[in-house]
């Protein structure tokens, strides 16, 4: 029967196997044939040899002949011999010197699947076998049946669920081979290395997202300094384009000043000066009476008029007894013979800190004829003649010169407005006041 089928099951010089051995050989499947996912892992009859896949042909199949028994190549013998041995031994090949790991024989399978066997090759290979630069490692090696590089050579139970990327699963597949035989597989695969560009891109992102980035920037001292300078620049631009915005931007803080006048020329000048020195300040104006002549004459009269304005507001209860106040009073003085000058007196009084300071504006020359007219318009029996004149110099100039205001005639004679004069003196007064204040209140 064996000879008619053309298969030499026993090489020359070896005793014929017993019937029990044949039965065991037929019942024991070939482990190398099972390792290939393309071949059926069992044999239904000893009349056929285990075929090799058509896509992989590194091993010569047994010589098919109907003549007398002939010599079978050692590669075929060594391939078939391991399943017949009671204990598995390392499989060697005469065509390759690569060592293979040992595999334990799987349990016998049913023979009903033998109908799925592929047609054996039509003839033996013409030439020998050798490795070359174009040799595909997935086509099997070392004389054993080819197997998938990512599959073990034993039939594993079906895996349920979704399989992951085969590259990431190569460690679990290679572990049973190494642990079962004590040696790793000769088929190796390159490890998947992480792209450094992706890592750099991920590590460069802030841990806290957008808010974390904003928080980190806001806590930077240099950024804070830049923001402060930017805020000051914006405020300067706004106040330059619209000077009326200054009171709204710089109004606030702990400093509260009351000016003893409701005229904008005085209140605005003092507000700008104190906000320039202190940064922020609340400056308001209240109308007050000086209880002296409308046009004071001499320094003493000027000081008296400024102080009387503050006292009148305190007596009437318009301001608190401890409220800091600034008062402005203008007067004329004959500094040289027949040479008169208009001067402004500024006083700041702070009862809480016991501060009382005075300052004077620059002297603005007044033509002698205007002073003489003001004297002539003042009655001799005027009850406040001791402090000054009934008619101010500004009123006289307004009557004699067209398009000139009685409250701001200084710009015509000097080119500098009265507001500018009060501002410069008030700034000096605010600087002195700041120096006299305790450090904690500055």
Curated annotation (Swiss-Prot):
Instruction: Read off the InterPro entries from this record.
Output: ITPase-like_fam (IPR029001), NTPase/PRRC1 (IPR026533), PRRC1 (IPR026534)
Q: Does the keyword Cytoplasm apply?
A: yes
Instruction: Enumerate the Pfam families for this protein.
Output: NTPase_I-T (PF01931)
State where composition is biased (Low complexity). Answer: 19-47, 90-99, 110-120
Alphabetized, the UniProt keywords read: Cytoplasm, Golgi apparatus
Question: Source taxonomy lineage?
Answer: Eukaryota, Metazoa, Chordata, Craniata, Vertebrata
Q: Which gene encodes it?
A: PRRC1
Classification via Gene3D superfamilies: 3.90.950.10
Q: Does the keyword Magnesium apply?
A: no
User: What does UniProt give as GO cellular component?
Assistant: cytoplasm; Golgi apparatus
**Localization terms from the record:** Golgi apparatus; Cytoplasm
A molecular function GO annotation: protein kinase A regulatory subunit binding
Q: Name one GO biological process term.
A: epithelial structure maintenance
Write the protein's name: Protein PRRC1
Q: Which SUPFAM superfamilies match?
A: ITPase-like (SSF52972)
> What is the annotated role of this protein in its UniProt record?
May act as a regulator of the protein kinase A (PKA) during embryonic development.
Question: At the top level of its lineage, which domain of life is listed?
Answer: Eukaryota
Which residue intervals are annotated with compositional bias (Polar residues) in the record?
A: 171-188
Signal peptide residues are none
Q: Where is this region: Disordered?
A: 1-47, 87-134, 171-204
This protein's species is: Gallus gallus (Chicken)
What does the record note on quaternary structure?
A: Interacts with PRKAR1A; resulting in PKA activation.
> Membrane-spanning regions, if any?
none
Which family does the record claim for this protein?
Belongs to the PRRC1 family.
């Amino acid at each position: 029967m064996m000879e008619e089928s053309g298969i030499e099951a026993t090489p020359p010089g070896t005793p014929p196997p017993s019937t029990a051995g044949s039965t065991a050989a037929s019942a024991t499947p070939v482990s190398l044939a099972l390792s290939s996912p393309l071949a059926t892992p069992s044999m239904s009859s000893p009349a056929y040899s285990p075929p090799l896949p058509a896509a992989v042909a590194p091993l010569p199949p047994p010589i098919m002949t109907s003549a007398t028994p002939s010599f079978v190549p050692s590669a075929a013998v060594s391939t078939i011999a391991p399943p017949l041995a009671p204990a598995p031994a390392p499989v060697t090949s005469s065509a390759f010197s690569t060592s293979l790991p040992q595999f334990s024989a799987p349990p016998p399978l049913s023979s009903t699947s033998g109908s799925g066997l592929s047609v054996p090759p039509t003839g033996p290979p013409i030439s020998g076998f050798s490795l070359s630069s174009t040799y595909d490692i997935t086509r099997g090696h070392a004389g054993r049946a080819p197997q998938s590089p990512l599959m073990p050579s034993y039939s594993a139970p079906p895996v349920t669920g979704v399989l992951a990327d085969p590259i990431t699963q190569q460690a679990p597949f290679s572990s049973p081979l190494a642990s079962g035989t004590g040696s790793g597989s000769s088929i190796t695969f390159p490890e998947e290395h992480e792209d450094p560009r992706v890592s750099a891109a991920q590590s460069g992102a802030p841990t806290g997202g957008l808010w974390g980035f904003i928080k980190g920037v806001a806590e930077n001292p240099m950024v804070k300094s830049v923001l402060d300078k930017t805020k000051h620049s914006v405020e300067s631009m706004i106040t330059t384009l619209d000077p009326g915005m200054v009171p709204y931007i710089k109004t606030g803080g702990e400093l509260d000043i009351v000016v003893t006048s409701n005229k904008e020329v005085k209140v605005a000048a003092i507000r700008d000066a104190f906000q320039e020195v202190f940064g922020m300040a609340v400056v308001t104006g209240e109308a007050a009476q000086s209880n002296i002549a409308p046009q004071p004459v001499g320094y003493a009269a000027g000081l008296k008029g400024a102080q009387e304005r503050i006292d009148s507001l305190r007596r009437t209860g318009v301001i608190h007894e401890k409220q800091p106040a600034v008062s402005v009073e203008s007067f004329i003085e004959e500094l040289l013979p027949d040479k008169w000058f208009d001067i402004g007196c500024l006083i700041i009084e702070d009862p809480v800190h016991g501060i009382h300071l005075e300052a004077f504006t620059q002297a603005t020359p007044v033509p002698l004829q205007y002073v003489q007219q003001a004297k002539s318009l003042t009655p001799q029996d005027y009850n406040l003649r001791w402090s000054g004149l009934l008619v101010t110099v500004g009123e006289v100039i307004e009557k004699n010169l067209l398009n000139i205001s009685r409250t701001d005639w200084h710009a015509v004679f000097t080119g500098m407005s009265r507001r500018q004069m009060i501002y410069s003196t008030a700034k000096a007064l605010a600087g002195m006041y700041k120096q006299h204040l305790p450090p904690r209140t500055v």
